[in-house]
Amino acid sequence: MLSRVARCSRTLNQVTRNGQSGLFSAVLRTSIRQNSTDSPASNNANEIYTKLSDTKDPQRNQFFQYTWGSWLTNDKSKKKQRETTFSIEGLTLFIDRINQLESKLAQPKSLEGAFVLANNKELLGSTKDKVIVRSIASIHEGKHHRVYKITLNTGKELVLRIPYKLDSDVAIASKLKSEVATTDFLKLKLGLNVPRVLAYGVDSNNEIKSPFILQEFISGELLMKKWHPLLPDSEETNKRLHEVIDPIAQFQNKILSVTFNKFGSLYFHDDVEGSLQNDVPYEGETDSALSNRWRIGPSVERQFTRNKNKLQQSIIDQYNGPWDASNPTAVLESVADIELENAKSKLSLINADAGANENDRALITKQIKTFENLKKISPQLINDKSKSIMNVEELFKPRLYIPDLDPLNVIQHSETENYFIDFEGSTIKPFILTSYPKFVAYQGAKIYNLEEDVPGYKEMEELEKQQYEFMYYKTRNERMWEFELNKYRHDLIAIASPHIKVLKSPYLQALDVKNGKDYLYVEGSIVQLQAMWEAYVANELVNSKDTKFPIEYTAEYLDQHQQELSDYQLETVSSPFSATGGWIPQDMFDTLKAQGILVETKDGNYKVETEKVLENPPAQPEEK
């Protein structure tokens, strides 16, 4: 194996039956709380009184509207995408219908356009009367879905998750099917602490009138409250960091225990097409109740849905798998293929528009060039038979990957019991092509020892020291994750090699493309390989015997790319709220607007008045 690269190379309160009218009355609570735990509700929560039979009650609308923030551009349309309207009366009827089913482990049962996991029927509790919804509270407005807490007359509590309309109907349906099946697999096969799912709907053709997941409510506090990544080194700091890292590493270790027969994503047997139903997902299942429960179908990893609304589903279906376990390179190539097709589709739409913006045309053309380069180099990136990569065969075997392993998605139900939530976008892929959880991942310059790695550190001004300390703490946290991985799965530790990280960087950068100019990071990661290509070929790390770099770059092209990348990075750093895509928390948005810092333009968007920022500097914290 090559030596390590240089270190410095980032509450319907109570629902009562009205004896005269036969109607239900209700209180709906909207809360600003941003986690699905049982912390005390905010004093700012709004109560909305309504009758369940009055579907046209205008007071209901605000219960479904997005309220957690606003955007500088296209605010109305983005909030419209995040409206989560559903039928409250339909929910009540549906839940009572579930209560009439027999509790048994079987394939999800179709019920009024939705699907029920009858084996989890006990989540409804016990009552001689009808099961009635007593209250509904909005408890979380996330990036991809909204969460409501449902309280029943049995005393039981459920969570209703409604996805935002950010993707196509087909994509939303696939993601819901796969997430429920993945959660079910983690619970039944691996015995992990995850919420039990009671029912799900993949479209609006059900009594709830919306796609949804209805699942177990888990009480507790988020593990994130314990995460303090920038604490100085000490025994206490080490202990506190491990209190967060360890349970997540242990959870991952259990996930990695199963090797699958294909690359793709998990679904229930009946949720994949017939041609895929004969292939078991993994070998050695001895429980007859589980042997035909799950299957592997198309991948729901985010690159197959993010910003793909204008791409025909038939094209997406060509590239989203599933793939045979013997062909891991297809997983790599699929990303380049889907992004290239998406860019070409966008260019076709621009060319068909006589009034199209030439800057948009130029940008898409550059994207196409980059993704053509990615398509060319992807099959050569990593040699899946390399003798220089320890346990390379294990690293390329199909294993389950959960992209949102994060303390924000871990609920401490008790001092010794953690529950994991949110498995959207989970996929089966080679472990070598996965990335570390975002809360510990660091792609910047590594500093392992402040005094040894930073010349003159002791003599630096405090502000300069803090910059290097930040880099050191991020490096330290990532290393702690790697030590845990090595402890549990030493056979997979080669993923920590700096060279492996560099080689798979173009693939990972492509997975992270969110806006038009992010292609620059993809290109940059390809360019980075050029200097080391001969050494990688000599050490059989890449899937090529040709020492000539696969992409021909001119000096002019590289200079232009470097300038455009630098300009984009400067634009990102200097533009307010660029890191959040122009999204601003609502309380901050209202304050900035009142101060005249945010000003509405003629087109309905908002701009930042720099001079007003200088007139209204952020308030300094009071001395205590």
Curated annotation (Swiss-Prot):
Compartment(s) of residence: Mitochondrion
Highest rank taxon of the organism: Eukaryota
InterPro entries named in the record: Aminoglycoside_PTrfase, Kinase-like_dom_sf, Mito_inheritance_9
GO CC terms in record: mitochondrion
Keywords: Mitochondrion, Transit peptide
UniProt entry tagged with the keyword Ribosomal protein: no
SUPFAM superfamilies, sorted: Protein kinase-like (PK-like) (SSF56112)
Keyword Metal-binding carried by entry: no
PANTHER family xrefs: ALTERED INHERITANCE OF MITOCHONDRIA PROTEIN 9, MITOCHONDRIAL
Name of the protein in question: Altered inheritance of mitochondria protein 9, mitochondrial
Species: Candida albicans (strain SC5314 / ATCC MYA-2876)
Gene: AIM9
